[in-house]
Amino acid sequence: MQTPNRSTIRAVVFDLDGTLLDTIADLASAVNYALATHGRPVRTDGEIRSFLGNGIRRLVAEAVPEGTTASDYEAIFATFRTYYVAHCMEQTKPYEGIMPLVRHLKQDGVKMGIVSNKLQPAVTQLHEKFFAGLIDVAVGERPGIPRKPDPKSLLTAIDNLGATPETTLYVGDSEVDIATARAAGCRCVTVLWGFRDEDFLRSRYPDAHYIHRPDELLTLDFNTL
């Protein structure tokens, strides 16, 4: 199968958590380790899933109990960050169909990148473990690169790939990803196997383009996006 309308797309940039990788188990373990270490009640996977999408500082801020002081929050966040960077690959895995999709795009000559609100060290580890030799660029949160929906991380990846926003497709799983793509001037596809409920997304972005399986990306007419 050939990628449709290949000439209109030079690059595909993916979100990481909830799009390429199912990271919820490792994130939940790190959040709950940090909470328990500091004597706070732990959260369910469902609660943690609902907190995702705006970076790890926001994730931890949502997870701590109401009334937590700023200094206590910083201590909990520091514990989370240290634990997660050390344990971010224990249960994380690609979603079904992701590896065949990425290999197909690579074989078809499409340049690929990752843009994530995850800290750069964890993004680098996961990129190297799962996508080395397949995906060319991986941009995470670091000094000078603000979190999505600020488009700078996506624009940085696009520039590093030698593409332009007009010739890039961005693929994500959340309202944050849709907003990021629109701010950057990219075409966007939103996946429905990730961390957001389909009804939630469609009610807020009825005009967005959605897919249920990775292989659907290969059958899209990119000119209609």
PLM ranges: what are they?
Residues 1-10, 46, 71, 106, ...:
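Asp-based, Mg2+/Mn2+-dependent phosphohydrolase catalytic module
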Residues 28, 32, 45, 49, ...:
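An amphipathic alpha-helix signature
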Residues 51, 55, 93-97, 118, ...:
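Short beta->alpha linker loops
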Residues 61-99, 108, 163:
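Metal-dependent phosphoesterase signature
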Residues 86-114, 120-126, 151:
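Short, acidic loop-to-helix structural element flanking the phosphoryl-transfer center
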